[in-house]
């Protein structure tokens, strides 16, 4: 008989609080010596149905050429209306010692409420951040920040009004990965910039940017980099979700002021390092990622990936080889959501995907890794993102047909679409119709690929004499990509059972298709209460889990990991609460809330009658 014990998860973590102080303008930095009430230009106020012309102030004819112009596209959304995250980052900019070598220009919009007295949510407004605080330069009719014409209009205006040697465009908002895109506008039904729309806007502007940055979640993807590679020299973005505090604006902007001759790689490195330091300070560093990508190296990476995809399609006619590939792929580091409660982003690390499958795609894997490491010129990552290599790629872990259709619009490889067609049994390339990315060529379909209809899986389950639960496959085992177990609590008095989680702690014989449980009479608990513990990712040195809870009455997911100290022992770490992805828009939450003393946590479990 196995003893029932429990493992307690420590809650000794702090919570970083966002505050919404008012700050504009800054009289202490008023170099002109005039009263601070005059440092903000008064734009003509008209009805919001009409465009407002440029306020008096600097234009192309009066502004001297700078070394850098930073164009911050700040879509406040719920990050600002609920927590003042945008205001906090603008506050950070007020601690910078400015000079004339760098123009820092901001467009605001996309939120119902700004947590300060200066910015008006009824307009698109444009500001300059300098020693005098924020100066209102221009305001326009309210429009969706998720509309490509809104973006291109701001960029063209900023480039014309503030000429410089180098330009940086920075996106501030939520991100949702390759399919969902970026810049979700709260005022316009979470309208976002998809990758095709992002490319459309940059093409309209026609400017080469030194840095294209994403202070958002999940946008350091191969598909995003490929979309913008014609229009920038470097991309700075995160594979994983970002905490609500975002980048360290005081630190990296001050570096730019002090080193205006720096190139995009140098500035990008400072953005990464200062961001990671900020995450360390707030306790969010374990899951942090940020990378600098040389966009000029992306075409070579896309070519190498297409060659690997060709090799991948070549194995789809042999089920055992395909099984080996998919088993390796699902072990790759994945980002964002990976449970029903969190939602699925289907973004995996390109490097880890390749490393985990290189025995199967041995002819092309090395070329992909070489091109990847050549493109990612700098990156930072936390201890539980140890396999993050700087760029993720879409992989169909759990997708709908509609998501596959959307991916076809942004895919970098026609051969990869053919591979997806095989592993997603109810989708075909023809379903995407004419919406396939026109930049790629989709090869003719092979008639030899395996299909799910060809395989019937038969198995037996039984409990051995010593009390272990066995699963033995009799037929169709070659089509199985993974085996995990569900753990249930049975209440015989009430005739109910509750799902307590999903894990992979099994004794596995993949050669013979035999598996049995490794249950040792223990299960994770939070302050003595068992939890629904769901495996998100199996890492080399850790397993990452998600626990559905309510925190102070709000549904969310507690992220935790089991980290191995030795081959046989380890410990739990709690990383905080993340609400996951919006089920309609695909927008990723940016708020990571750490548990603190006094929080009220309710553990959620699925219970059913038998």
Go through the PLM ranges and name each one.
Residues 1-4:
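Positively charged n-region of N-terminal signal peptides that target proteins for export
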Residues 8-19:
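Bacterial N-terminal signal peptides
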Residues 22-25:
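Bacterial signal peptide processing site
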Residues 50-63, 175-178, 182-610:
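Terminal, contiguous helix-loop blocks that mediate binding/assembly
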């Amino acid at each position: 008989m196995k003893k029932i014990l429990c493992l307690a998860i420590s809650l000794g973590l702090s919570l970083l609080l966002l505050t919404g102080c008012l700050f504009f303008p800054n009289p202490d930095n008023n170099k002109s010596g005039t009263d601070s009430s005059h440092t903000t230009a008064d734009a003509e106020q008209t009805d919001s149905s009409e465009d407002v012309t440029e306020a008096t102030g600097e234009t192309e004819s009066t502004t001297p050429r700078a070394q850098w112009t930073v164009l911050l596209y700040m879509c406040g959304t719920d990050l600002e209306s609920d927590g003042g995250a945008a205001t906090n980052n603008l506050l950070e900019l007020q601690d910078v010692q400015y000079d004339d070598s760098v123009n820092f220009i901001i467009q605001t919009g996309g939120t119902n409420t700004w947590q300060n007295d200066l910015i008006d949510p009824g307009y698109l407004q444009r500001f300059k951040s300098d020693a005098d605080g924020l100066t209102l330069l221009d305001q326009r009719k309210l429009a969706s920040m998720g509309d490509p014409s809104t973006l291109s209009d701001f960029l063209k205006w900023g480039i014309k009004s503030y000429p410089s040697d180098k330009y940086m465009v920075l996106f501030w908002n939520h991100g949702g990965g390759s399919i969902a895109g970026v810049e979700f506008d709260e005022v316009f039904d979470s309208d976002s910039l998809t990758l095709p729309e992002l490319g459309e806007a940059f093409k309209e502007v026609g400017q080469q940017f030194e840095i294209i940055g994403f202070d958002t979640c999940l946008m350091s993807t191969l598909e995003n980099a490929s979309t913008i590679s014609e229009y920038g020299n470097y991309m700075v973005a995160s594979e994983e979700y970002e905490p609500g505090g975002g980048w360290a604006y005081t630190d990296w902007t001050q570096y730019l002021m002090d080193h205006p001759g720096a190139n995009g790689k140098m500035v990008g490195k400072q953005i990464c390092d200062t961001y990671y330091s900020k995450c360390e300070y707030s306790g969010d560093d374990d899951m942090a990622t940020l990378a600098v990508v040389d966009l000029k190296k992306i075409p070579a990476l896309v070519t190498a990936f297409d060659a690997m995809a060709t090799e991948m399609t070549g194995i789809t006619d042999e089920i055992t080889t395909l099984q080996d590939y998919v088993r390796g792929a699902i072990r790759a580091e994945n980002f964002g959501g990976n449970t029903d409660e969190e939602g699925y982003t289907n973004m995996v690390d390109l490097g880890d995907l390749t490393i985990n499958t290189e025995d199967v795609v041995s002819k092309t894997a090395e070329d992909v890794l070489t091109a990847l490491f050549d493109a990612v010129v700098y990156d930072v990552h936390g201890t539980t993102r140890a396999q993050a290599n700087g760029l993720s790629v879409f992989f169909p872990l759990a997708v709908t047909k509609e998501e596959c259709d959307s991916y076809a619009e942004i895919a970098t490889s026609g051969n990869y679409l053919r591979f997806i067609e095989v592993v997603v049994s109810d989708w075909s390339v023809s379903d995407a119709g004419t919406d396939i990315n026109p930049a790629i060529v989709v090869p003719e379909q092979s008639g030899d690929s395996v299909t799910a209809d060809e395989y019937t899986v038969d198995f037996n389950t039984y409990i051995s004499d010593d009390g272990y639960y066995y699963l033995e496959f009799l037929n169709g085992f070659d089509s199985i990509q993974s085996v995990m177990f569900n753990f249930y609590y049975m209440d015989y008095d009430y005739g109910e059972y509750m799902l307590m989680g999903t894990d992979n702690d099994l004794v596995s014989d993949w050669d013979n298709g035999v598996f049995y449980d490794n249950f040792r009479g223990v299960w994770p608990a939070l302050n003595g209460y068992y939890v629904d513990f769901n495996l998100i990712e199996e890492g080399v040195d850790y397993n990452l889990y998600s626990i559905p809870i309510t925190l102070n009455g709000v549904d969310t997911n507690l992220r935790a990991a089991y980290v191995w100290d030795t081959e046989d022992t380890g410990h739990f770490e709690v990383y905080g609460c993340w609400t996951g992805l919006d089920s309609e828009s695909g927008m990723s939450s940016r708020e990571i809330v750490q548990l603190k003393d006094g929080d009220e946590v309710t553990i959620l479990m699925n219970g059913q009658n038998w």
